[in-house]
């Protein structure tokens, strides 16, 4: 009999429970630390989107929540630009450091300048739970910190790659003696691997992890979220939905002051199907809206959180580049993006044609959370109230 996906998920949950969740870990709590009053969440339309497909008037149909619900609540910068290499790791690296990056495109090298996470944690003497990168892109394992001697792993962010954590969990669960027969478990693992193999992650993509690993309490928390994922009647069906699910879990349990969330389903555009690209854009728009709703539902975040939404880069134009499917030509369409800010300190219903750069995000975060950037090309956005 063919195993249905939802039944498979429930079987996996049963296999995982004892392995992932020792009972005593439920009783443990991370000790309370003094937190900054403000919170910042940066969300990227990872993979890159073209201005014409999103923030241009003809693209509003693809971002209905941003265009009609979130932009009126905040401030939009329609003229933003990504400067530097138009690959995923380097473009997001520039976003979190405020400086152009030129490291391995597949994530084997950390940023060469200090990230906002390191500088935030070091200046305020904060624990790792206060800064997170949650990314669908599996090459972002080293995005949480640089290798600078004065910073690095002791001050890095926790980096969570939800798809990879789930894959490891599945592999470990099916290797145990409990649960269904060995052949059934192998077949189930193969089905789950296929279900999770979304986005443009072919040969050459590897996971490079930081030297610092999650403490047991954090691992237990994430395992609980995975079990919820398996048992949810509306179980997520894409990498970005899983990333969103895990982001909510981190917010609920630890209320970190600084979060960078990388949605990346949009990079399916590399397969050349415009309809799949637009579906991913609309899904990202929906998830951003749902994330903002979740912010409003939590006392730790409501009225004290600034949300910034920005594409990590654009994509090629049809004329000067290789079309929506790529982002390596470096043409203007690859660089023209936008930024939407809302929440604490952001004027409502505003907009400015003043050109900005994605590198301006990092020093803006620094101003909001009250720390200094030691090296930065970007400039804080003066329209926001610090």
What does each model-found stretch correspond to?
Residues 1-16:
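N-terminal secretory signal peptides and thylakoid transit peptides that target proteins
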Residues 106-219, 239:
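A contiguous, mid-domain pocket- or channel-lining segment that forms the substrate-recognition surface
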């Amino acid at each position: 009999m063919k195993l249905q996906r939802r039944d498979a998920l429930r079987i996996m949950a049963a296999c995982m429970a004892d392995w992932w969740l020792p009972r005593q870990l439920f009783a443990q709590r991370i000790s309370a630390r003094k937190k900054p009053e403000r919170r910042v969440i940066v969300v990227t339309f990872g993979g890159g989107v073209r201005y014409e497909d999103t923030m241009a008037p003809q693209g509003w149909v693809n971002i209905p929540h941003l265009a009609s619900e979130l932009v009126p609540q905040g401030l939009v910068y329609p003229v933003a630009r990504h400067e530097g290499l138009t690959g995923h790791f380097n473009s997001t690296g520039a976003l979190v450091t405020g400086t152009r990056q030129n490291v391995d495109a597949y994530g084997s090298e950390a940023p060469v300048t200090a990230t906002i996470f390191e500088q935030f944690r070091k200046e305020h003497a904060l624990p790792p739970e206060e800064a997170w990168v949650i990314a669908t892109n599996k090459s972002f394992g080293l995005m949480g910190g640089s290798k600078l001697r004065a910073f690095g792993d002791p001050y890095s962010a926790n980096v969570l790659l939800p798809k990879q954590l789930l894959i490891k969990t599945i592999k470990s669960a099916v290797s145990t003696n409990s649960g269904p027969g060995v052949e059934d478990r192998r077949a189930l693992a193969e089905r789950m691997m296929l279900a999770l193999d979304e986005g443009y992650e072919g040969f050459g993509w590897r996971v490079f992890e930081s030297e610092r690993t999650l403490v047991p309490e954090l691992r237990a928390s994430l395992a609980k979220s995975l079990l919820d994922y398996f048992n949810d009647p509306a179980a997520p069906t894409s990498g970005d939905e899983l990333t969103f699910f895990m982001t909510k879990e981190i917010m609920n349990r630890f209320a970190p002051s600084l979060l960078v969330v990388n949605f990346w389903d949009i990079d399916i555009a590399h397969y050349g199907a415009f309809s799949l690209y637009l579906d991913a854009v609309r899904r990202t728009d929906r998830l951003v809206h749902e994330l903002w709703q979740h912010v409003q539902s939590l006392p730790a975040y409501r009225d004290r959180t600034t949300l910034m939404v920005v594409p990590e880069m654009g994509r090629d134009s049809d004329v000067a580049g290789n079309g929506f499917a790529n982002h390596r030509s470096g043409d203007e369409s690859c660089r023209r993006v936008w930024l939407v800010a809302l929440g604490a300190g952001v004027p409502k219903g505003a907009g400015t044609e003043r050109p900005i750069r994605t590198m301006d995000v990092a020093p803006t975060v620094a101003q909001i959370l009250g720390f200094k950037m030691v090296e930065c090309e970007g400039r804080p956005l003066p329209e926001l109230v610090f």
